[in-house]
Amino acid sequence: MKTTARRLLTLTLTLACSALCMLAMTPAARAEAEPEHPVKPLLWKIEGKGLIQPSYLFGTIHISKGPAVTLHPAARIAFDASSHFYAEVPLDPASQMAAMPLMMRKDGRKLDESIGKELAAKLNAELKLINPALDSSPFQTMTTWTAAILPQLLPHQMEGGQPLDMKLWDQATEAGKETAGMEKPAAQLIAFTELTEDEQIILLAETLKGMKKERAEGKDTTQELIDAYITGEPEKIAAVIDRSIREMAEGEHKELGEKLLKRLLNDRDKTMADFIIATLKDQPADSHFFAAGAGHFVGEINIATHLVDAGYTVTRVEE
């Protein structure tokens, strides 16, 4: 039970940004052969400002299968050489279990009572399409924003396996590296926990609407994102994310979309960059490996650009 809960919470926490894009988590069948690992790693070396050893930034994708969960050899060398490993949030079982209450309702109501019969029926319909045995019964004590995210995660959860972030955390622990989160779960999820119930209901409705639309059109934005990640090209990853953001920004609930974008990406980029800068300043003699979702390293302003602005030299490592 603890292992299942840990995996579910890890997916919920680290895939929170997927709600921003309203992605349907239903990977398409792959006809072509896949590489063993990404063609290029999303890896950057940090130097300068008195650092005695280089440290590294690494972009992950929060899935649990395929070549994306195997480190590129260059990333493996950097990871093995580091003495400290950092994920977005602490991924040890105790920290994950302690964060579970963030996902639970505190208003004394059941989910169906809050969202109404029509939306509840749509949620159940989507769950049945994922697996005929699924329904919303386990969701009734969860927050509405959690119910908006979980349908997108369940296919990965049901496949089993560990997301790359968790695999690296466990490997770091087994290797005796120091481990920590760059954020606390409560801070990472504030984008959702600060939403009003009406906003959470809109998020759920728009998520289900997006899943249905992609299915009807035969699209799979998630697979597009995975494919882009495997190429190791930040521009391709940014293009997929930017398209999803544009679609949301042009939609009916533009203000809500803009608020989520700011909280999930812009604010968190700065928060994690500040943590990295403070860590490097405090421990310049050690090699640190900072892993966060790929979306935090693409675009005009991101974690890496914040470090450059702070005076560090940040260089892409491609092989």
Give the location of each predicted region.
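Bacterial N-terminal signal peptides
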Residues: 11-24
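A cross-kingdom marker for long, charged
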Residues: 255-319
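N-terminal secretory signal peptides that target proteins for export/translocation
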Residues: 1-7
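Structured, acidic catalytic/metal-binding patches in enzyme active sites
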Residues: 34-35, 42-260
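Alpha-helical scaffolding within the catalytic cores
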Residues: 39-44, 272-274
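Sec/Tat signal peptide C-region and signal peptidase I cleavage site
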Residues: 26-31
